Amino acid sequence: MTAIDDARYMDLALALAQAQQGRTAPNPAVGCVLVRQGRIIATGATQDGGRPHAERVALDAAGDQAAGATAYVTLEPCAHHGQTPPCAEGLVQAGVARVVIACQDEYHEVAGRGVAILSDAGIVIETGLRKAAATALYCGFFQRLSSGLPQVAVDLRAGLYDAELTAATPEAAKAQIHAFSAAGMNRVRVAPDHPLAGLDWAGLLNT
């Protein structure tokens, strides 16, 4: 596989993740592409509500063809036993030969452990491909992990957004924004004529 091929497959994984943004809370939206002998054999994205995870979706679709394949994932595969088994272990059990990861997961129960599981199993690991794009995709998730606060960007243009602010007071707006964050929504629109359009949002979120 060439570097151009790697970038193309990771771009597809990022697009799959982006398409699920705002639908996977409390988990981040992840994309996964499985490639074998230069051919895409399966794709997956984190499903609504946060599970199944992207890797599980792709592995289930690929079946036995996953053996010897390369997996392109936008975020480090999970390593802990929660409501589902670790995706890192699933990749090992499926016989995946190589895993390309865009960025490391900052969640304390993963944070390098997923990579360690894969590496210990003899899987070739490459990290950092399209890292900037992946970090931008997960900026809200990482912010919530580090501070407990949502990361909110206010766009006054009527473009694509996950939700629209309707609260009319700062107190109500704060509650509504945190509700949006809990639901995994990252892009909130404030209409230009909204009474809170000129509010200091950083101050709002930290009060």
Stretches with model-predicted labels:
Residues 2-20, 83-207:
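Zinc-dependent deaminase
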Residues 22-26:
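Short loop/turn motifs at secondary-structure junctions and domain boundaries
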Residues 29-38:
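Short beta-strand scaffold segments in enzyme catalytic cores
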Residues 42-44:
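Short hydrophobic alpha-helix segments
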Residues 47-60:
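A short, polar/charged loop-to-alpha-helix boundary motif
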Residues 49, 76-79, 165-169:
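Short, flexible loop segments at the rims of nucleotide/cofactor-binding pockets, characterized by
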Residues 52-53, 71-90, 109:
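Local cysteine-cluster metal-coordination motifs and their immediate loop/turn environment
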Residues 65-69:
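Short helix-loop-beta connector
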